[in-house]
């Protein structure tokens, strides 16, 4: 079981930052399938991350062991023993209708990334782990899930209950932060 957000009297803002602190990419899971209520909460989290217009994002919640096994064999980057998958997809036709070419190439990807991020932050609050998977061929994923040509798979989220002794995350990750202009270090201004 992964660390979960402590049930304290902290403010909602503190709870969000604690969930961010606990966020991990898990690559080894137990064989136990997370409960339907947990998967429903992840779907809810993805829905709250909306960047694009309604109807652009589609989610496929995959729990059929045979289908998960097919994904495992067909997608080289897939986490080997995750018992569930959420496939985040974009409707390119609808995106083009309501937002034009930029909607297709930029907004759909931002929308899918936001959904993946919200799922990732929600996971430790539910006692589960996730891992974003992006190493696969679009056509293969479309074929596995029967996606029409105008539905593009964006991200596969491996979902499961992490093993007890999972590796600790790399500490100290921080992006390069600039102030006002590229090359001006943010820390020099504080």
What are the residue ranges of the model-derived segments?
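A short coil-to-beta-strand element that immediately follows conserved catalytic motifs
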Residues: 56, 128-132, 152-153
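Small-aliphatic-rich amphipathic alpha-helix that forms the alpha element of a beta-alpha
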Residues: 46, 86, 102-144
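A glycine-rich helix N-cap at a beta->alpha junction
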Residues: 79-85, 146-169
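Phosphate/diphosphate-binding glycine-rich loops and adjacent basic-rich segments that engage nucleotide
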Residues: 168-190
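Short secondary-structure boundary segments
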Residues: 90, 135, 161
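N-terminal amphipathic, basic helical "cap/leader" segment at the start of enzyme domains
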Residues: 1-85, 89-95, 188-190
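Glycine/charged-rich beta-loop-alpha catalytic/anionic-binding loops adjacent to active sites
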Residues: 69, 95-107
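Residue-level "edge-of-site" marker
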Residues: 59, 136-138, 155
């Amino acid at each position: 079981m992964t660390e979960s957000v402590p049930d304290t009297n902290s403010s909602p803002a503190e709870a969000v930052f604690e969930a961010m602190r606990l966020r991990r990419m898990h690559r080894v899971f137990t064989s136990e399938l997370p409960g339907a209520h947990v998967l429903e909460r992840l779907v809810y989290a993805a829905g709250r991350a909306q960047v694009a217009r309604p109807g652009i994002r589609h989610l496929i919640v995959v729990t059929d062991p045979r289908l998960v096994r097919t994904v495992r064999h067909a997608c080289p980057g897939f986490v080997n023993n995750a018992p569930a998958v959420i496939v985040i997809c974009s409707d390119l036709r609808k995106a083009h209708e309501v937002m034009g070419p930029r909607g297709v190439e930029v907004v759909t990807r931002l929308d899918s990334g936001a959904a993946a991020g919200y799922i990732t932050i929600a996971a430790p609050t539910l006692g589960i782990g996730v891992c974003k998977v992006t190493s696969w061929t679009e056509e293969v994923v479309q074929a596995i899930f029967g996606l029409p040509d105008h539905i593009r798979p964006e991200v596969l989220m491996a979902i499961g209950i992490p093993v007890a002794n999972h590796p600790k995350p790399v500490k100290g990750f921080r992006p390069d932060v600039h102030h006002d202009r590229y090359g001006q270090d943010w820390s020099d201004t504080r």
